[in-house]
Amino acid sequence: APVVAPAPAPAPAPAPAPAPAPTPAPAPVTVAAPKAVEYPLGVTEIVKNDAGTAEFDLFIVHTNDVHARIVPADGGMGYSKLSTMLKMGRALTDNILVLDAGDVTHGTNLANMFEGETVGVLLDMLGYDAVAPGNHDFNYGADRLIEAARFAEEYTDLKVLSANVLDENGYLLFQPYQVYDFNGFKIAVVGLTTPDTATKTHPKNVQGITFANEEIFEIGQMAIDMAKQYVDYVIVLGHIGMDPDGASGLTTDKIVSKIKGIDLFIDGHSHTTLKEGMKIGDTLVVQTGDYMKNLGLVQLHVKNGKVTATYPMLIPAADVLNAKDSALAKQYGITDVPNDPQVDEYVGYMSAQLSQKLNTLVATLPENLDGERANVRTKQTNLSKLITMAMTAESGADFTITNGGGIRASLKAGNVTMGDVINVLPFTNIITVVEVKGSDVYAALEHGYSKLPDQNGAFSQTDLQVVYNRFAAPGKRILRVLLNGKAIDRNATYKVATNDFMAAGGDGYTMFGKVLSEGSLLSDVFIEFLKKNYPVK
């Protein structure tokens, strides 16, 4: 039977009610914002799209080895056109990730004169999500790069990522990875920097820094394994490259073969053009070449948290610069890719600042220095002698061999500006030290002197004493080569300063051996040499 509670005693009559008080306003309701997802090492997830769509296309735009080609140059499209293309893409979808695989901040006067600031601002303006530092991004010194990374972290959405750049105590100098969320589909981007950086920038730029040369596979696998616990897709943004002749011997294919779990490797450093990417095991490797001659695009089709299809491609700069005649552009109904006026305005402003810098006085010369084309391509001149002296002194090499074709103007007696020197040495060449056997020194000079009496851009400018017979048959012209008054030993090995173009076999100098180190810009070194020896009066 149901249990019935006893009836309560009758309540006392209520007291007369007081006058009603005014009804207070309801307290405001505080709604807590969703807590940002945090991952190991203090990494906070970035939500790029939270629409919750289960099936969608994701577009990964990538560049590498732009080397500060800010405006169209050397076959590249420049940042103004790229900005317009990105705006076109973002007008259609929020599912876009923009990444750069390094060597981006150094390489032209518009970047170099401002220690990379011009490029950093442009990367932010264009909405880049992440960049992995390359060896030449250290050319302004590690402190400058670290400062730029911290500035980007505080004031922009750009991340500078590298999981293998360590200080002298073994601590990471950069954020190692970043997680991005597209409709619940999570991507980890892990940065890597080539251990070749130890020798492919001036040693002073990376003093006290290591690149986990021996531990990179272990560190990389740990990073990927950790990422796989939290994300659906792993991208390595690596300035590593395909060149097996690098000082470290570390190449992308070695990393991909030994580190498991990488879905996409966006590569740089070797300036390799992979038109449709390259599969190594289960990993897709992509690289665009250099100077923004191509824009990389990887389209992922995502369904219920899984990638069901991947479409890599390159968009050639020629199709962007001349869209009206491009079959590729016509497929998408594009007839013109105009410049972005905001980018043009900024580049114009910085170009004006550059002009002011180039007017800075650096030296006062007592005499004219001869850089006339017909002379520097057939004989030593007083200008070429000073340039080779500066290269040897800066690099610590035994001597210098550089190409006469790299000297493009003379310097007049009197005041010399920074712009005057850059007119002499306009190619942003980097001083490079190579290992060369004595017999190959003779071979290099024979090559350089082979076209005499005709002019030759490959003519060897050197601070060695060269005794030669210009009328002998090519290949038999060099009689004797002296270093500090002593004959070069054909069986000995020497450290030779040259430029990065020649070290890579440019102008036919294929006899140069292993690269020992890369240093500063040749123009910067010569400016400092003139300042020291011919101060402004």
Regions found by a protein language model. Give the residues of each.
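Catalytic centers of hydrolytic enzymes
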Residues: 39-57, 68-70, 83, 87-91, ...
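Gram-positive cell-envelope targeting signals
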Residues: 1-2, 108
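Acidic, metal/ion-coordinating pockets
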Residues: 34-324, 378, 382-390, 400, ...
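Ser/Thr/Gly/Pro-rich low-complexity, disordered linker/stalk segments of secreted
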Residues: 2-41
